[in-house]
Amino acid sequence: MVTFSSYPFDPRPRRAIDALVGAGATIDLICLGDGKAPKREVRNGINVLRVPLKHPRRGKVEYAFRYGIFILTSGVVFALRSLLRRYDLVYVHNMPDILVLSALIPKALGAKVVLDLHDPMPELMRTIFHVSEDNRSVRLMKELEKWSIARADLVITVNLACRRIFSSRSCEVEKIAVVMNAPDGQIFPFRTPPANAPANRVDTERFVIMYHGSLVERNGLDVAIDALATVKECVPCAELRVFGPSTPFLEKMMETALNKGIQDSVRYLGPRKLEELVTEIGKCDLGVIPNHRNAFTDINTPTRLFEYLALGKPVIAPSTLGITDYFNRDSLLFFEAGNATDLARQIEFAYFHPREISEIARRGQDVYREHTWDRERQTLLERVSGVLN
């Protein structure tokens, strides 16, 4: 297996590894080194090789340079190891898509190749670099995507929206399996919403709205803060709690809260481990996913959505394709992506109608139960087994 990310911190490769090891696989893993973990180690029976490269943080040139070094390194390692023992399978995680190059020698010697496309690179590039679909780099990403998919025996992706995109421009739909990023049931135990929620909310000390995740512009913390400023006019006890690693964008948003006079109602509480997030979600009244609308968020199905629902909490999410493929207005509170006024309206509805949103959360849990990790893991193992057989 190869991934341009750190192990065991990137959850999707980690859980794929756990699933395959549980099914009896022996795994050699090539991944990024974070400067702290050893370059080589045997961890839980997995042979781990870490390449000492930092994840790129700047422009396209740095991305291309670091990707190139990593692809060359992993390709050479897999080629040399293939001389000593033949691989049955090479499992490649994007980004980049052309990391599949590292599997060329094992494939020539008979190995099957699985390409796990976490994100469509053209859409992500459009979002990160604010370029149009006709941009030359975006067109190149589409060509590389098609070329990379052609090298794979099986493509795995994260939701129906991504499957539609890949099948529309790169391969037949039958080649693509959907394995969603569902919460770990061992960490996020299933909890039902209150059975007898009141029809109306009595005055409370506070009404806690929660945001957790990456604090970048596309994820819409600014939308949540603008909405909170409106909500405070009729729900004075409303409070927004923010969790995630600090960023310059967060600092800018805290200044915005200060300028709006709601700084005491926007609490930044830092990053949390998954186990700690369970406790924090348990303390909130409502989760929000306040995304802006762009090429990437339009097709994204946030794992955070399922994390709230697993713990019985109502959640407001944008009415984008990656979400409406699975949920309708009976099972989720929707707002128009990027629209702070609409988000404020839905938060107010949630506050004043506790019984109704409890029922909506309950129906949302029915959707979540169709996509628990136990089910998604089984899909993964069945499709990989089908390729090998």
Where would I find each of the regions flagged by the language model?
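A short, well-ordered alpha-helix in the C-terminal region of glycosyltransferases
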Residues: F349, E356-E370
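Nucleotide-sugar-dependent
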Residues: D10, N219, E275-E280, G287-E307, ...
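N-terminal subdomain of nucleotide-sugar transferases
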Residues: M1-N47, V231
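Carbohydrate-associated surface elements
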Residues: A161, A182
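Conserved donor-binding/catalytic core segment of Leloir-type glycosyltransferases
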Residues: I156, R201-L228, R241, A361
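Nucleotide-activated donor-binding/catalytic signature segment of Leloir-type glycosyltransferases, i.e.
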Residues: E251-V278
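Conserved acidic donor-binding segment of nucleotide-sugar-dependent glycosyltransferases
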Residues: R329-A340, F349-R355
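Membrane-proximal helix-turn-helix segments that form the acceptor-binding/catalytic region
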Residues: A79, L101, I105-L109, M121, ...
